[in-house]
Amino acid sequence: MLVEINPSKIYGKVKAPQSKSFGIRLVLYSLLKESKLDNLIPSDDVNVAINVVKQLGVSVEGTYFKREKELVTPKFLYFGGSATTLRMSIPILSVLGVDTIIDGDETLRKRPLNAIIKALEGSVSFSSSLLPTKISGKLKENFVRIEGGESSQYISGFIYAFSLVGGGEIEIIPPISSKSYIYLTIELLNSLGGNIKMKGNKIYVEKGDFKPYIGKVPGDYALASFYASSSIVSGGEIVIEDVYELPNFDGDHSIVNFYKMMGAESYVKDNKWIVKSSEKLNGIEVNVDDYPDLAPSIASLAPFSSSPTIIKGIKRLKTKESNRVVTISETLSKFGVKVEYDEDKIVIYPSEVKAGHVICPNDHRIAMLASVLSFKSGGTIEKAECVNKSNPNFWKDLISLNGRIIIR
């Protein structure tokens, strides 16, 4: 798919894309208790999660999920490009007992499994440290010690796994990256009857009394941020509906404050994110280690600021769908933006954004970044269907917001 974008003023009302983080967690929750996800719009990654729970023994009828029998581990599981589903599923498989070959697409085959292999050493074996790999064995005790720097998703997976078997303890070896996603998992499960506490670098999972989840999948701030930044750079005003109220911990919702710090009017009221453009934007310095998915969103506004933007905590960007340190920088450069990076940071300078052409490196957020830049000066994006990984309505929504977009 080729998308051609002409300069446009983005404004109006739009529903936030459904949260991939919440969507996958709520689908996996059906392993613990039945779920009815009223407004579920499956993206590629959510479809992977649905397929996994079905193969483990959950009955799925439309948006209704119910576990009707003992869970089983199949001989083969395919995870597409969904790293979240993969990393949360391996701990679950390990407590059930597993003799399964797991695989994924070319992007997932590049993702390391080192932390989970080390954590399960002595109980569960892996035939390879990269996909495809065969996993065999069963966790011998309801305790695990795992490095926290590779991915918080393994830790979320163990929270689910120990909730499934009546309790357990997780000791995290610092540093702990993306801690906000661990808080998200704990808060979600505790709201549904879980009994989970985090003290320092330890998580204690006690037997829970889980209740069915019947409700909506909340909106995703990180995905919605590209609508917001498109409006900001083009001089518009936008209301993004169906977002969750801001919790008392940092996370993807922190983008609301980051855009405010950069000079835009940005706030949440009554489950709506209201964003208005500003005559002047300014650069910020931000560490994204706890919310790496916000790096492309921040980068989308940075060239239009009056001072440089410095993005730190970028280590985990290198093992996303693409090496985002490189692909963010290359994408900005193709639109005439001055950008520099090293091992520790990306520096984006105020620049005159020009029309650009990007071939999506099979990374949804890079295509979304390119779209924001294009609304200012025009641009074309090849392989634009990559947005389906997280938000299949992306281009349709932007057209509804006055985006002058031609899809070929």
Swiss-Prot record:
Instruction: Tell me the active site.
Output: D293
Q: Reaction(s) catalyzed by this protein?
A: 3-phosphoshikimate + phosphoenolpyruvate = 5-O-(1-carboxyvinyl)-3-phosphoshikimate + phosphate
Chief localization class? cytoplasm
Entry GO CC = cytoplasm
Tell me if Transcription is a UniProt keyword of this record.
Answer: no
Query: Pathway it belongs to?
Result: Metabolic intermediate biosynthesis; chorismate biosynthesis
What PANTHER family does the record point to?
AROM/DEHYDROQUINATE SYNTHASE, PENTAFUNCTIONAL AROM POLYPEPTIDE
What is the name attached to this protein's record?
Answer: 3-phosphoshikimate 1-carboxyvinyltransferase
- Protein source organism: Sulfurisphaera tokodaii (strain DSM 16993 / JCM 10545 / NBRC 100140 / 7) (Sulfolobus tokodaii)
Lineage, highest ranks first: Archaea, Thermoproteota, Thermoprotei, Sulfolobales, Sulfolobaceae
